[in-house]
């Protein structure tokens, strides 16, 4: 990975992986990539293989109790985590350690907001049958899942988490207001979007969006967002529509 300048106290992501060459990947493109080049955020891939044992740098072993696959060894992972921890706060609120795992809690926008408000993050990319539970417990790792599907490793999931998080860092997006009107920012899916031409193959832009009446446009967008959320994500709608408890 190419070294980039880093502004003082820039938000930093440390990624423990067997495939450091896969980073920054898509994060090196577009706005997140430009922000990385400018030093608005920093990325430090950590090669787990360098902490392996023996001539072949072994990082895994067979599961205790039998079964298929291999498990990442706790001693190997601990050495990588100790290196990653250098210069970082001990408080997990200031610097979460996140293990990308299919059994973790679902990753949500509020998690991205929480991570972005921290000083940085350490992401652990699993492989094979995962990581020894003892090191997960000992280091207070937070387990996050990016969807109900099993991947071959955590690298793609890590890039997803970083993309959602780094775009919330001040200065990364050209227009900070755009983050306030996106899907999930207020618990709803985003309303439909349109642009020129006004008539495309007989399909026209809803007249209210061309009316110039900002109040009516806002009402239309809110109604559309609510309807889409009810139809496509009833699980989100239940949370939004739930009456607030009086303080």
Swiss-Prot record:
The protein, known as:
tRNA (guanine-N(1)-)-methyltransferase
Q: Which residues bind S-adenosyl-L-methionine?
A: 126
- The main enzyme category here is transferase
The UniProt record lists the EC number as 2.1.1.228
A single MF term (Gene Ontology): tRNA (guanine(37)-N1)-methyltransferase activity
**PANTHER family tied to this protein:** TRNA (GUANINE-N(1)-)-METHYLTRANSFERASE (PTHR46417:SF1)
- GO terms under cellular component: cytosol
Q: What gene name is listed for this protein?
A: trmD
Protein source organism = Jannaschia sp. (strain CCS1)
Known role = Specifically methylates guanosine-37 in various tRNAs.
